[in-house]
Every structure is written in C-alpha cells, then in structure tokens.
Amino acid sequence: MTQAHAGIVTRRCTEQRWLIDNIIRSVGIDWDQPRTVSYNTPCGPEANADFAGIRERVKKYADISPAFENVARRRATKARAAEDAGEVVTARNNYFYAAIHYAASQWPHDENSSKNLTLNAAKRDCYSRYAQHADHHVEAAWVPFQGKALPGWLHLPPGHQPGDRSKLPAVWSIPGMDGFKEANVALYGDRWLARGIAVLALEGPGQYESAVNGIPVSVPNWAEAATAVMDWMAARPELDPRRIAVTGNSFGSFFGTLVAAHEPRFCACAVASTCLEPGCHTIFEEASPTFKRRFMYMSGYTDEHAFDDFCKTLTWEGHAEKIRVPYLCVAGEADELSPLEHAERLLQTLQCPRQLVVYQDSRHSVGNVPSANLGPHPQTLVADWIQARFYGKPFAPERWFV
C-alpha cells in the first residue's frame, strides 16, 4: 500500500503551516494535545528524560518525526545490548520505550510512504521483543476483517497463560485518532491488569496500523468490526464471553459508542475525552488543521470536498439509541475539540443505564486540572466503573460534576 494515501492537501494545513511552526516554536510539541504526557505515562519515570529532550528538540512540525525516531533508535540499541548481556528487565523496558517512540514518530506521516512503513516495522519489531520479555503474557492479535486483519495486542494479567480457561473479564481498549495500541497498556502498574482484567488493545478501521494495512474509517466498517472483534474475543478460552466490555478514549469514544450500538454482546461501554459532535465540525474546522489532515488519511480521502461530505456520516445519531448495556461518559467541561453539549445530548438520547461525569475546567484530554486531582482520577474512575459492571453491581443513572 505504499503511497496509497499520498497527496492529501487541506486548505487550512496549507495556509497555516507557517502558523503551526510558529506556535510549536512558542508553545512546544504539545500545542494541539498533551502527547508527550500521554506517551510518557505508560512508560513510567525512566522515560521522563526522553520526553523532556524531545520537547526541547522540536521547534517546528518537521522536527516531530525525527525527534521521536532518534530516541527510538537509541532505546532499541540499549535494549539489544541489555539482551545480549542477559539483562532481561532492562531489555524489556527499553524495547517498550523504543516501540512507543517509533509509534509516535509515525504520527506526522499522513500517507503510507516507505518511511511510514519502515517506522511501523521497527515499532512492531520492538514491541514484539518487549512481549517476549514482559512480566505478563502478551501476544500479537490479528482479527480477520474483510480479507485483511485488524491489528492488536492481547494482554493477560500476571499469572495467567493462554489456554488456561480462567474465564477472565476483558476489555477492548480503543485508542484515539492520534493514539496507538502500544500505549494503551502500561509497562508496569496497568490499571486493567492490576484489577485482573485482560486487555485487547486493538486498532479498529482507520486507526494507526489499520490505516497502514489499508482498512479505512467508516461507520459501516466500525459496525462490522464490532462483531469481528467480539467473535475473536469470545472464542478465546481464557476470556469470559459474558464479561467483555469496550472502552474508548478521545475519538475512540465515538468508535466505542458505535461498537456498543452494533454488538450487544459487549456487556458495558465506557468512554472518555469525548469526540461526540455529529459531523465533527469543531475538531476538523476550528482546531489544529492537523486533525483534519490526519483523519483524511485514516478514511482514505485525498479530496477535501469529498471528505467534507463523508464527515456528515460521522454521527452516533441513529446508532446510540440501540445501546442497551451500561454506558459511562467522562468529559471535560471546556472540551475544545467536541463541545460538552454533544455529550449531554447523547446521554439524553440513550435508552440504557448511563452515567455522565464532567470534570470542571478540563479541556478535551480529561485531567491536568484540580478537579481531576481532588476528585476521582478519570482513568481510575473508568477502570473501577467497568470492574463493577463485570460483577453486576447496580448504579444510579446520574450526572456528576467533579
């Protein structure tokens, strides 16, 4: 699929490239989203210096990919040296860090160029080597889909092995538009594994490696993927098919909602940092131009006018009404990518047990505000809520303002 999406041009990306570079020079690499925080979190404290160095190195858009790639190569070199010396834990850690950095270096590549494919291969190699040394079972997951396969990684809690028929509860963890499956399970102290919950970190249609593999975003594709993924998970002897939930972050909140609407076997759905505006006008026309360009790549469009028509299909309306399982929505009061009113309207439309939790002053990426520190931590809240659903604990349909 080399060059399959080459030639993406958007008016604002072209006209405002100089502005993006100047904003990055003034504000830094996290101008549009707290990416270095999001990527640092699953790595833990040893990687802090990596991200601090990247923040210093990046002064313009073109610096982003090389900055992450350089750190990835250094970490991969350290991992191989540790492996040769028999230092398994050090090798494990460094392969994980390298995979995260390689994945991050792919983000600016909005086409399946030879460079993007090379970075993707390096990412997979490092994460596969991490999986060999991990402190829990990790295996590559390929879910058959339309003659191809959706890419993921299956994680079992420590102490469990494939085929042991332990009937674990499990979640399908869906990343956001700019997120990737490798960062959805922490190197240590993961919130799901620590609760005895297995995790399928899998990229659905259009997301990261699925886009590389030529599987584009569309509402019908996500509806079909919901059943494909559930069939795969339900067939695993280690997992309890009655206790499989779906959770999505950022644009994964929209995808997760579609999944719950079209596959009733998922027993619960929890979403956070919402992208629930029908048509996605705010994120594509008022936020950083990079969001629109990225999603055009994800959906396989090169013509902006055709993509604008396609965006009209990106809605939960006519789908969310079908959800019958418990639904949690965690949102920021000041979400700049998807105004809170759209999450409010979705919750009013749902015909299932539901709960909305709004964090005061929080922007799209819920957290980094006093309410997220003084109240329940957003990601912890989601994990505890889903765990409670696995064990059938009742809850009152409520709207919390934290």
Model-derived features: positions:
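Catalytic active-site module of serine/aspartate enzymes centered on a nucleophile-bearing elbow/loop
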Residues: 371-402
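Alpha/beta-hydrolase fold nucleophile elbow
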Residues: 237-250
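Short beta-strand/loop motif that positions the catalytic acidic residue
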Residues: 323-324, 329-331, 335
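Hydrolase active-site cap/lid region
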Residues: 258-309, 325
